[in-house]
Swiss-Prot record:
Gene Ontology molecular-function annotations: iron ion binding; N(6)-L-threonylcarbamoyladenine synthase activity
Taxonomic path: Bacteria, Bacillati, Actinomycetota, Actinomycetes, Mycobacteriales
UniProt keywords, alphabetically: Acyltransferase, Cytoplasm, Iron, Metal-binding, Transferase, tRNA processing
Protein name: tRNA N6-adenosine threonylcarbamoyltransferase
Cell compartment(s), UniProt: Cytoplasm
Amino acid sequence: MGIESSCDETGVGIVRWHPDGTCELLADEVASSVDQHARFGGVVPEIASRAHLEAIVPAMRRALSAAGIAKPDALAVTIGPGLAGALLVGVAAAKAYAAAWDVPFYALNHLGGHVAVDTLEHGPMPPCVALLVSGGHTHLLHVTDLAAPIVELGSTVDDAAGEAFDKVARLLGLGFPGGPALDAAARDGDPHAIAFPRGMTGPRDPRYDFSFSGLKTAVARHVEAAQRAGVAIADLPIPDIAASFQEAVADVLTMKAVRAAQDMGVDTLVLGGGATANSRIRSLAEERCAAAGLTLRVPKPRLCTDNGVMIAALGAHVIAGGARPSPLTVASDPGLPVSVSQIA
């Protein structure tokens, strides 16, 4: 069983490990508080924590019922990174259930879960590069084994890509969450209408790092210039702005991800995280992987967003790799680095 509570989704998932290295999905329960955050234009940590408190026990019961079991053989939980208060709810629940059931407890990394969940659809994972893109994270990772430490090749130096989507969507009056709203608006737009900048793509820039604050600022300045010229927000070419912004983000993400895979000598690229549900990120990744001779693995959108199944899948791989259980005294770590797969 895996429990996830790092942001605004309360997830409980159950998987069964098979000797051939595959995981079978038995239960996937997710309760989201996203509607409670919409009027604030972003996730409010206190609201998220209270929502987890209300949702965690019912989600546990539903998952056990769906799997047809009384208790799991082991229990894994997201110990970090994430919102401090949100993490505390999931970790406290996991410790209590593990103690009551007398089952092994594993404190795992949220980001590793986003990689591991792909095995539910595509089977055992070969050495690969993983691109994780969400509201709080943008990382390029080198993965040799899900039971081994993951190497971070690069990350964003400022805004996460998903955060930039949310902020630009709010600027354009498209609402929250911004990712789906921008994606929908961009479908009717011209991705080449506006030449927005591609951050950190110069010859002297870090090879695998990202920056989206300049792009976000460029969109804001474009809108401000139109407003100074007397154009109201409602009269702006929103589809063109959305499509051009989305193209800039997808261009940089996929270019650097394919480059990293080639540099690492692997033939597989894995996408994970909620923002990889974006249609342009997926389609451009497909185009560039095909051109580079890489295999692209992308979980279905439901598994890309936060869920308990991803933590259960990571837990199954960690256990199969011989990891010892975590002590019940471990504390959640909101800033846990991706290189720490488990706090033991």
